[in-house]
Amino acid sequence: MLGGGNERMSTIPAFNQIQFEGFCRFIDHGLTEELSKFPKIEDTDQEIEFQLFVETYKLVEPLIKERDAVYESLTYSSELYVSAGLIWKTRRDMQEQTIFIGNIPLMNSLGTSIVNGLYRIVISQILQSPGIYYRSELDHNGISVYTGTIISDWGGRLELEIDRKARIWARVSRKQKISILVLSSAMGSNLREILENVCYPEIFLSFLNDKEKKKIGSKENAILEFYQQFSCVGGDPVFSESLCKELQKKFFQQRCELGRIGRRNLNQRLNLDIPENNTFLLQRDILAAADHLIGLKFGMGTLDDMNHLKNKRIRSVADLLQDQFGLALVRLENMVRGTICGAIRHKLIPTPQNLVTSTPLTTTFESFFGLHPLSQVLDRTNPLTQIVHGRKLSYLGPGGLTGRTASFRIRDIHPSHYGRICPIDTSEGINVGLIGSLAIHARIGHWGSLETPFYEISERSKKVRMLYLSPSRDEYYMVATGNSLALNPGIQEEQIVPARYRQEFLTIEWEQVHLRSIFPFQYFSIGASLIPFIEHNDANRALMSSNMQRQAVPLSRSEKCIVGTGLERQVARDSGVAAIAEHGGKIIYTDTDKIIFSGNGYTRRIPLVMYQRSNKNTCMQQKSQVHQGKCIKKGQILADGAATVGGELALGKNVLVAYMPWEGYNFEDAVLISERLIYEDIYTSFHIRKYEIQTHVTSHGPERITNEIPHLEARLLCNLDKNGIVMLGSWVETGDILVGKLTPQMAKESSYAPEDRLLRAILGIQVSTSKETCLKLPIGGRGRVIDVRWIQKKGGSSYNPEIIRVYISQKREIKVGDKVAGRHGNKGIVSKILPREDMPYLQNGRPVDMVFNPLGVPSRMNVGQIFECSLGLAGSLLDRHYRIVPFDERYEQEASRKLVFSELYEASKQTASPWVFEPEYPGKSRIFDGRTGNPFEQPVIIGKPYILKLIHQVDDKIHGRSSGHYALVTQQPLRGRAKQGGQRVGEMEVWALEGFGVAHILQEMLTYKSDHIRARQEVLGTTIIGGTIPKPEDTPESFRLLVRELRSLALELNHFLVSEKNFQINRKEA
């Protein structure tokens, strides 16, 4: 964050700064730290020693460009070279070489990595910080039991608890408990040292009986007792060196390593002065923790809040990459040690070059980026999605929580989240509260804590100083929240201001304030900060809006929002989709795919993105915004990207909306739209789909790409070139051949022609035939071929498959079934497209574009859409754009309503349109029915809100099937569009059919159309040749499955025919 000339003004930090800082910290410090841990490796005879020289490592510039790595499915990485030495102790000679130890994936300008052609991003993880935490729980008798939990750097736990008799026990990983004296003795302390280093020696002596004295009589006895309890072994184990090593490895090294963060936290909590480089648990730590636990028992000290952010740490991209690099070096160490032993055994002369291989490092990073839960494919639906994805925080992942076991208390909002984690932006569903988003100004500190900035208020100095505070520090300050000074420092300070102190919200005098906020919505994430009038919305609807903005599809003709918040420009710039001038100069040439400009004494060519596919099949494209001969300055926008206009984020369109019912077509949030949105391409978007095919070498020979495909119609092959690949610019429909391919296979003996049999009998020649395995365009894939990539793997091996990728562009207008949404959680499905002349129209004759259901506003409590709607109408008439800061009620009561009404009044005056602002019902207007011309009975709210078209489109979801695959067990249709699934009539579907009075079709629904194998085959044949469909005689497969399952429970199910006569006789006898 940079300060300007005015010391109270500052810029918002770059939104992708979290990723860049983390990766730079890994390159600058993480690599050196892990390389310095690499040990010296000796052979068994200690004649040869191998070591790495950390000071001289280097990363080489990548050999390929980012764009080529994406198209050719390669990894954009850098080669790591380190100096290594091989020392011959007997000869006192050293051989030093610079060796290549592997590739490290690099981070590009978007803050992402390209691995195997995919943009991947590593999100940060929230973990419980290592240290000690005290809490109180009630036992089954309702008595408080105090416990202290020591959490290691790897997540292992050691619990200390004090019972009703003030006896202290240690419990390792919830196993059997042992006395604190036994644990301390096993760690090397005798009874005298224990009593000298505790504050309450009399309590320790109180539960020291003869049995306990025997256990701690010597270190060996204590270790045996501890090993017996820790490993849960029976009998009487015998003390030995191997037992000590096992205990040292399993417990003291794995479960007692605190790390630097844990050592720092433990020193602060227990008032210790142990050096921070001593990262293992010591006897002093155990005894100090026990002292504090005794103090809690007698009412001294405070308990810890486990959900406070001061007790959490952020595992950033730097930490995750450093852990993987350390794991790779451990594997490399084992490999080098085995290679040295093998070379000595076979009497070979090793060199540093042939001792080291790049496989451990390269495979470790590829496995991490491909399989780790925190490494995700970058969501590139729109620019906002890209930038928000890298700012996510997750409680999930290795060492963290799971969605099914996390409690409500962990998911809830905590006061320490203020300015650090957004209280609104989280995922919906099972992971709610477990995946959050960083606030705008939050940053990750050196110790893994989340920091947020404040302005310090000092009476002695008039200068304003900015401080970044961790969650443990801002508890001791009175922090003024939401004061008007955050935007306008000229306003006189109020006498009474709201403030936050020690996790409580108070109202105090201004003289008592220590710190104040620097931004009106610094506690929100990017997604929530883009919602205008967010203070008038329910938090649940704001959450939905934050998520739905990330699902907006870039439109072919984007438009800036009339009502915004002011962050749209920075989001667009930091997302990297726009081309920005790095220095000043003059434009020499510009066209659709490049910009050439000169400056600083040289000429530079900037390629523009043209029809690039995102992983959500949206179209990424850049459009030049400068002209030839124009002079530009540093930081100026050269080309707009997808969903940006003039360097600002533009996700949707400002359309004319009326809130009114219309013939039931907006029932349950459905949306009625005008055909103008189709004919004028208002909500038209381009989508690019990728289809690929591989050629392999089979046992009968290699597969061939060719345009000579036998037994196929000529119309299906008309778009192929001489190589058998579809031509650029071709228009293709469903079923067309994109790539012609023949797979060789051996023909059956009966299918040989007589001459083939003669050749085979005389010369032994095997006659092969080919099977057509072409790449065909699937259902719903019509469009224009915009790109074809034929990727041939380097090396010339015939076993490396060739990959052919065909990219097809689709133009999609808005249609019935598409999902649209506003920025206030108001979402709906398009239910009907009306002609323009039938839509309701205003008093100036203009028909509205959309009709929303007014019942969706009061119950959802998202009134912000009404403010935006009316202010947007005023802005469109006055040709103005508004940037509204949230929580403007702090300046004046009813500030939002006064602003909207004043703008509407001014618009009605300037345009001489009194219907824009009518004092009887301000914000509403009388509109007319397009079908009859009669006015509606009630005035209607009309306006111009910003409406988005979401990626949930009917073209991707609609699905039909006549026959297809069936489940093997139940013989019922599979589920899902991807599997060509069908409908499964279950219990509730049967109830629905019965309830609607169509029970007579249940038999065919449950037999022919479901799981009666023979009946559905007969139906298919009868339908083709004509005739009467036979009735099924036996039971369907699901009933057979029920019978088998009952038999597995030793229950036999039989059926008998009972006549009515016998039934009556049996009743009389009874």
Swiss-Prot record:
PANTHER family under this entry?
DNA-DIRECTED RNA POLYMERASE I SUBUNIT 2
Instruction: Give any Pfam family that matches.
Output: RNA_pol_Rpb2_2
Name its species: Cucumis sativus
Q: Where is the signal peptide?
A: none
The UniProt entry lists the main location of this chain as plastid
Protein's name according to its UniProt entry: DNA-directed RNA polymerase subunit beta
Instruction: Identify the keywords attached in UniProt to this record, alphabetized.
Output: Chloroplast, DNA-directed RNA polymerase, Nucleotidyltransferase, Plastid, Transcription, Transferase
Is the Signal keyword given for this protein?
Answer: no
> GO molecular-function annotation terms?
DNA binding; DNA-directed RNA polymerase activity; ribonucleoside binding
Q: How does it assemble?
A: In plastids the minimal PEP RNA polymerase catalytic core is composed of four subunits: alpha, beta, beta', and beta''. When a (nuclear-encoded) sigma factor is associated with the core the holoenzyme is formed, which can initiate transcription.
Tell me the Gene Ontology biological-process terms attached to this UniProt entry. Answer: DNA-templated transcription
Homology family: Belongs to the RNA polymerase beta chain family.
Family matches, as CDD domains: RNA_pol_B_RPB2
Q: Which InterPro entries match?
A: DNA-dir_RNA_pol_bsu_ext_1_sf (IPR042107), DNA-dir_RNA_pol_su2 (IPR015712), DNA-dir_RNAP_su2_dom (IPR007120), DNA-dir_RNAP_su2_hyb_sf (IPR037033), RNA_pol_bsu_bac (IPR010243), RNA_pol_bsu_CS (IPR007121), RNA_pol_Rpb2_2 (IPR007642), RNA_pol_Rpb2_2_sf (IPR037034)
Source organism, top-level taxon? Eukaryota
> Which EC class is the enzyme in?
transferase
The protein's location, in the record's own words, is:
Plastid, Chloroplast
Q: Name one GO cellular component term.
A: chloroplast
Q: Does the keyword Transferase belong to this entry?
A: yes
Q: What does this protein do?
A: DNA-dependent RNA polymerase catalyzes the transcription of DNA into RNA using the four ribonucleoside triphosphates as substrates.
Which reactions are catalysed by this chain?
Answer: RNA(n) + a ribonucleoside 5'-triphosphate = RNA(n+1) + diphosphate
Q: What is its EC number?
A: 2.7.7.6
